[in-house]
């Protein structure tokens, strides 16, 4: 099966500025994507309801970061956003998950329940909630149907969590979305940890990740990451990642056993 393929809008935020939403959508539609994830700091959130009827693209989620001082900003978006049913939420109140993060979730979840919106916790390297284990603990503590997790291959790899099969088994009850990137551990990467690259680059074996998810029955969408530091032509990078993903997907369907690796430290 072909999974819906989305791209995060970070790829459109370059050193020279940000491509308008209309251009983002035209590029994504032309290069074969089914949707996008929009960052909460976009100046065009009010236009999201036009995206599906005009370009046929789904808004998979709004990506948002909570840190102390952003309570009103985060709450207002959850209360008012149209055109999507998901918030991907990174938590960064300190060096680990703090009471402030939990209070934020306590405030947001009733609103989400009323509006039919999910929160997908977004483990993020060098943030307070870095690991899948921390996200799972929050899901277990809150035990709320509108709370789940994004499994992000990039952040799992950058954090060097290891134990891919075990981490996926642990996350599956709450899995809402999977995000991917080409990446390699490098002090030149994001946060001095790891690069963000098109899917046909890097040392992270995304084919193995796709296979592990397929064996667990994952049928949801995939999101591709981007970042201004990846360089190159934005349109060309979109093409490369889309082609690499569909190639891996097709290969996996024909040869599912190819994705089963001899166990290593990961």
Stretches found by the model and what they are:
Residues 1-9, 18-29, 107-110, 132-147, ...:
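Histidine-acidic metal/acid-base catalytic patches
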Residues 4-20, 62-70, 91-98, 198:
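Active-site mouth loops of central-metabolism enzymes
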Residues 37-39, 61-63, 86-89, 120, ...:
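Conserved beta-strand positions in the central sheet of alpha/beta enzyme cores
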Residues 40-42, 65-68, 91-95, 125-127, ...:
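Active-site-proximal loop/turn and secondary-structure-junction residues that shape catalytic pockets
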Residues 41-51, 96-105:
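Active-site-adjacent beta->alpha loops and helix N-cap segments on the catalytic face
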Residues 53-66, 112, 141-142, 205-209:
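Alpha-helix-loop-beta-strand connector modules within alpha/beta enzyme cores
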Residues 67-149:
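Active-site acidic/histidine proton-transfer and metal-coordination neighborhood
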């Amino acid at each position: 099966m072909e999974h819906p393929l989305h791209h995060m809008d970070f790829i459109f935020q370059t050193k020279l500025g940000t491509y308008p939403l209309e251009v983002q959508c035209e590029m994504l539609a032309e290069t074969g994507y089914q949707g996008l994830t929009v960052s909460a700091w976009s100046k065009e959130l009010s236009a999201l309801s036009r995206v599906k009827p005009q370009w046929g693209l789904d808004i998979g989620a709004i990506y948002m970061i909570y840190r102390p001082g952003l309570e009103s900003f985060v709450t207002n978006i959850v209360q008012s956003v149209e055109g999507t049913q998901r918030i991907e939420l990174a938590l960064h109140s300190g060096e680990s998950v703090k009471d402030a993060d939990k209070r934020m979730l306590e405030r947001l979840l009733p609103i989400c329940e009323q509006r039919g919106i999910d929160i997908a916790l977004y483990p993020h390297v060098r943030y307070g909630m870095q690991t899948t284990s921390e996200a799972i603990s929050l899901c277990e503590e809150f035990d709320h149907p509108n709370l789940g997790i994004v499994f992000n291959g990039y952040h799992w790899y950058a954090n060097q969590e290891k134990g891919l099969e075990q981490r996926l088994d642990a996350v599956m009850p709450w899995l809402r979305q999977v995000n991917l990137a080409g990446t390699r551990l490098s002090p030149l990467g994001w946060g001095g940890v790891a690069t963000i690259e098109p899917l046909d680059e890097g040392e992270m074996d995304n084919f193995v990740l796709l296979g592990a998810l397929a064996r667990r029955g994952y049928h949801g969408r995939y999101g591709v990451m981007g970042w201004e530091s990846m360089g190159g032509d934005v349109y060309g990078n979109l093409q490369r990642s889309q082609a690499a993903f569909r190639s891996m997907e097709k290969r996996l369907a024909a040869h599912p056993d190819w994705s089963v690796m001899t166990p290593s430290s990961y």
